[in-house]
Design a protein with these regions (language model features):
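Metallocofactor- and cofactor-centric catalytic cores in central/energy metabolism, strongly enriched
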Residues: 1-327
Length: 327
């Protein structure tokens, strides 16, 4: 390992010793030796699966099969989140094939352009999944989100339930549209009064034109890359288009993977344990190596702190001295 990277990593470990230990103690206290729903009163448990189909009810009554929470940020106004409309059904089918059950446990506010008070909204997003996950119905969670402050907020939420294994599922990038040079040309003509508003709108709509993340390497696409580097989503899953057959296959594979990571599986790995100081350094390296969004110099600090890990901008600065820009 590069000596600077090792020094920064060890510095973060030492700085975070007390807060990390307190965090790990908290999530260890929340861990159970059986499925979480076994602790519920019968009335509460019956309420939790009342709307399920018969075979899912039987599975949940048995106390033997995993129940996986689906936390979604689907809406129709945000192109990167519109593909999530049909993900729950894909996930449920994949979970059934793995002898598990999937339930949509709740949603989060998901907007991007024009969202005011960005960091406050990130905190609201971080708190929203707690409503669904706090019912103690679930043995793992899948998080559907990709844009700007939504992924950082979801990560903070997942870490607040760090005793559960969690996997993030991206939606993938929008296909390329109108080339940037042409878009810039039309914007310039509009500024000069040589084309009207409709021409400008047609240009913008031809550029930002389909489901998926924006066609530039902004915060949303940085989210996908950083989360992949941190081991929170499947390798190679970031940049597959929403309508590609591979995207559906990756979504199903992510659902099956989280079942293997539960206490009933053979690869038990709660997110809070996996998300350690080395994972955080991997995230910073991913950001620096890919020339990602500088918004993550704020978001990664908050994400790490949610796991009891303390990083600061000196860590970013020192790592930036030795991490080459690859793309």
């Amino acid at each position: 390992m590069n000596s600077t990277m090792l020094r920064v990593t060890n510095r973060i470990i030492e700085r975070s010793r007390d807060t990390r230990a307190a965090y790990l103690a908290r999530i260890n206290q929340a861990k159970t030796d059986t499925v979480h729903r076994a602790q519920l009163a019968c009335g509460n448990l019956a309420h939790g699966f009342a709307a399920c189909q018969a075979d899912d009810k039987a599975s949940l009554k048995s106390m033997l099969r995993n129940n996986i929470a689906i936390i979604t940020s689907y809406n129709d106004m945000l192109s990167a989140h519109q593909p999530y409309e049909h993900y729950p059904e894909i996930i449920r089918k994949a979970l059934h094939s793995a002898n598990a059950v999937g339930q949509v446990a709740g949603g989060v506010p998901a907007m991007c352009d024009g969202m005011e008070r960005s960091l406050l909204i990130r905190e609201v997003i971080a708190m929203s999944p707690a409503i669904g996950l706090s019912h103690n119905m679930f043995d793992g969670a899948l998080y559907l989100g990709v844009c700007d402050k939504i992924v950082p907020g979801l990560t903070m939420a997942a870490l607040s339930f760090g005793h559960l294994p969690s996997v993030f599922i991206p939606s993938g990038p929008m296909a390329s549209g109108l080339p940037n040079k042409e878009k810039v040309r039309i914007r310039q003509l509009y500024a000069e009064g040589k084309v009207d508003r409709m021409a400008l709108l047609e240009s913008e709509a031809a550029s930002y034109h389909a489901p998926g993340t924006c066609t530039f390497y902004g915060t949303a696409n940085t989210n996908q890359m950083v989360v992949e580097f941190m081991g929170m989503q499947l390798p190679g899953s970031s940049f597959v288009h929403p309508d590609a057959p591979l995207r559906e296959a990756l979504t199903a594979a992510a659902a099956r993977q989280v079942t293997r990571m539960t206490g009933n599986g053979n690869e038990w790995m709660p997110l809070g344990k996996m998300f350690d100081e080395k994972v955080v350094v991997n995230g910073i390296v991913a950001l620096l190596a890919t020339g990602g969004s500088t918004n993550h110099t704020m978001h990664l600090v908050a994400m790490a702190r949610a796991a009891g890990i303390i990083i600061n901008w000196d860590d970013f600065s020192d790592l930036s001295d030795v991490v080459p820009l690859l793309a």
